[in-house]
Amino acid sequence: MLPAHKQTLEALLADSVTQVAHALKGADAAFVAPAITLERPKVAAHGDVACNVAMQLAKPLGANPRQLAEKIVAALTAQPAAQGLVDAAEIAGPGFINLRLTAAAKQAVIAAVFEQGRAFGTSDRKKGKQVLLEFVSANPTGPLHVGHGRQAALGDVLANVIASQGYAVHREFYYNDAGVQIGNLAISTQARARGLKPGDAGWPEAAYNGEYIADIARDYLNRETVAAKDGEPVTGAGDIDDLDAIRKFAVAYLRHEQDMDLQAFGVKFDQYYLESSLYSEGRVEKTVDALVKAGMTYEQDGALWLRTTDEGDDKDRVMRKSDGTYTYFVPDVAYHVTKWERGFTQVINIQGSDHHGTIARVRAGLQGLHIGIPKGYPDYVLHKMVTVMRDGQEVKLSKRAGSYVTVRDLIEWSGGAAPGQEAAPDLIDEATITRGRDAVRFFLISRKADTEFVFDIDLALKQNDENPVYYVQYAHARICSVLNELKSRYNVDVAQLPGADLAQLTSPQAVSLMQKLAEYPDMLTHAAKELAPHAVAFYLRDLAGEFHSFYNAERVLVDDEAPRNARAALLAATRQVLENGLAVLGVSAPAKM
């Protein structure tokens, strides 16, 4: 049901409820009507729309719910505005109201899609509001791994979903460039520069073993220049003993590499925020001082503790260790203060489920500052791990990273690059990258974030209905082919189809497809509200299934103009919604496959 029709029907039902309540209790009686909730019945035979308002009213009105439902239906169908929407009404069970929509109401979605085009499904209901969405936020110590890939897909798609509701979305990447791991990166690069490799005597125990470290060391010694998208160029000094210069070069090198990973994945950020800036600008110290002054801390065993139990944590947490260094959640608190100070009253963080323990600590620290930040700030979407399978075996290692599969590996393998070909990236063409990006983005968004995901490379390469991204893209390509044939055989252009006689669309398959199209706007609204980007992938698979059912049941390219153009109009609307949904996922909508 289209949102406009839903709003109209909700208003008509609310008015009907008021009429019935006044008839039973008197116009002056105090009465608070419940919110009208409309749902699509799980069983198609029960109608198009179901409402349980009669059962909600039974107790406050002291009436039998089934009899109430009958009165509400009578009041509803008596309203002229309802006659264009409601074809029939039935009472089921203890008092459910099941409504059947008119054919015209179901067909209206086609005109709406033609009229709105790429904007179909979007809303401006949240126009003027802004959201900061933080995701990926990897340490600049290596290539992005598949966990970062899942986070990138979740974050980018959720940003698109939220933006579809009118929000101004600010995408932010927080670089953890101030921790112990950065020191390990520096000594790893230094060891490689000295000619050592993993397993050699003198190889640092905490060093990173991936081949990318050798690449960094080579470019550092060759005095190459590298730069992240938002950073100043850094030139390798070539001095093996200058660990600080090595660190700066290695961080810049890997930030650039991560930029390339994100570019291949089709993800862009509005801002990169450096953890190191929190220290250089004194924000960490300022935050700690404020918590001390607020009485939220105490000292014990030489350490500074935060009273996180005051804010619901299971135990108090160490903020500053006895050696004077801060625990990892302290700069996180300072960082979130900057989000609040920048005017972002709604913030969403997408992180791995291993960060679950930091949620209470960060929120407790923010509450302890007493600067007006609401409880529950920020929101979190936590995702579980990704396992990569190929040839029935788990893939754990990568030549690039040494100990994990990278996002770039996954994109290239899923696009059809042969194992080992990643060593010669110049041989991998753009078409391979596009296929791989489409598959990886769709697959990684196709499950709820809180479920573990098995990424099957072999499935991503299949060109049949088993592969979900192929299944959806093929539906789009098939429609393009039919509409091209319509033009060549009958000289009918898509621009002519809005004038088609949609009364021809009476088959169960056509009606079901139209109903699925009409669900798209509400699906986006729900996905944004529930922070559930996977809903878009679920919907597109269902829509592709409805299309295939319709296409297999009805011939489109027939000589009879009326049914031909009506069916073609339905296909054109379906193509547009498929294209819109794939755009939200950041997946291409090919015209040929």
Curated annotation (Swiss-Prot):
Q: What Gene3D superfamilies does the annotation carry?
A: Arginyl tRNA synthetase N-terminal domain, HUPs, Isoleucyl-tRNA Synthetase, Domain 1
Q: What class of enzyme is it?
A: ligase
Statement: the UniProt record of this protein carries the keyword Ribonucleoprotein:
no
Query: According to its UniProt record, where is this protein mainly located?
Result: cytoplasm
Catalysed reactions, semicolon-separated: tRNA(Arg) + L-arginine + ATP = L-arginyl-tRNA(Arg) + AMP + diphosphate
User: GO molecular function terms here?
Assistant: arginine-tRNA ligase activity; ATP binding
CDD domains on file: ArgRS_core
Q: Which UniProt keywords apply?
A: Aminoacyl-tRNA synthetase, ATP-binding, Cytoplasm, Ligase, Nucleotide-binding, Protein biosynthesis
Q: Name one GO biological process term.
A: arginyl-tRNA aminoacylation
Among SUPFAM superfamilies, the record links this protein to: Anticodon-binding domain of a subclass of class I aminoacyl-tRNA synthetases (SSF47323), Arginyl-tRNA synthetase (ArgRS), N-terminal 'additional' domain (SSF55190), Nucleotidylyl transferase (SSF52374)
UniProt GO cellular component terms: cytoplasm
Q: Which compartments is it annotated to reside in?
A: Cytoplasm
Under Enzyme Commission nomenclature, its number is 6.1.1.19
Which InterPro entries did the record assign? aa-tRNA-synth_I_CS, Arg-tRNA-ligase, Arg-tRNA-synth_N, Arg-tRNA-synth_N_sf, ArgRS_core, DALR_anticod-bd, Rossmann-like_a/b/a_fold, tRNAsynth_Ia_anticodon-bd
Q: Motif 'HIGH' region residues? A: 138-148
Pfam families given in the database record: Arg_tRNA_synt_N (PF03485), DALR_1 (PF05746), tRNA-synt_1d (PF00750)
**Family classification:** Belongs to the class-I aminoacyl-tRNA synthetase family.
Q: How is this protein organized at the quaternary level?
A: Monomer.
Q: What is this protein called?
A: Arginine--tRNA ligase
